A protein has these predicted regions:
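Small/aliphatic-rich secondary-structure junction motif
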Residues: 2-52, 74-85, 140-144
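C-terminal, charge/polar-rich interaction regions
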Residues: 72, 81, 85, 97, ...
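Short, structured motif recognition centered on aromatic/hydrophobic residues
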Residues: 17, 21, 29-31, 65, ...
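Hydrophobic alpha-helical membrane-association signature
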Residues: 14, 62-66, 123
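A short acidic, glycine-rich active-site loop
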Residues: 51-62
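Glycine-rich, Arg-bearing micro-motifs that act as flexible, cationic patches
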Residues: 104-130, 144
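Short acidic active-site motifs
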Residues: 90-95, 123
Length: 144
């Protein structure tokens, strides 16, 4: 079982479904958090011109993002062993790679209010065409 964790609250419903499914089927869970350098801010720059990035600090921060999103789930599902994967890569590419040995890939559906809430995000759309196992795209409730 594989779950994509993007670090936002939009991941929570997907994480919940993935833990439930892994527990129900008695399988391990792989929690994947992939990040790309194009999304980084100058918060991690060590150069006043914003050129050099502190890759160790970035990796530490990205591991913390995944740990924060998974907090509490292991206590709720003690029977589910979790392997954490944090990589600098496109989320769809890493999730697709993990899907080759998975029974199910679970991801959230991006979209923030209005018409966009009815659309799939780029990762979900990509995985629909490339994933090697069943794919579950979980709706995130729209905040009012």
């Amino acid at each position: 079982m594989v779950v994509g964790v993007d670090g936002t609250e939009n991941s929570e419903p997907a994480i919940a479904e993935a833990f439930e499914a892994a527990s129900l089927h008695g399988v391990d869970l792989v929690a994947v958090h992939a990040w790309r350098d194009s999304h980084l801010t100058t918060a991690f720059t060590s150069d006043p011109n914003g050129v050099a990035l502190d890759w160790d600090a970035i990796a530490t921060a990205e591991h913390a993002v995944l740990a924060e999103r998974l907090a509490g789930w292991k206590e709720k599902y003690p029977d589910v062993a979790v392997r954490r994967v944090v990589v600098k890569d496109r989320p769809a590419r890493q999730l697709n790679a993990e899907s080759t040995s998975a029974q199910l890939v679970v991801v959230g559906r991006r979209g923030r209010g209005g018409i966009s809430s009815m659309l799939l995000g780029s990762t979900s759309r990509h995985l629909m065409h490339t994933v090697w196992c069943p794919l579950l795209i979980v709706h995130s409730p729209v905040a009012s």
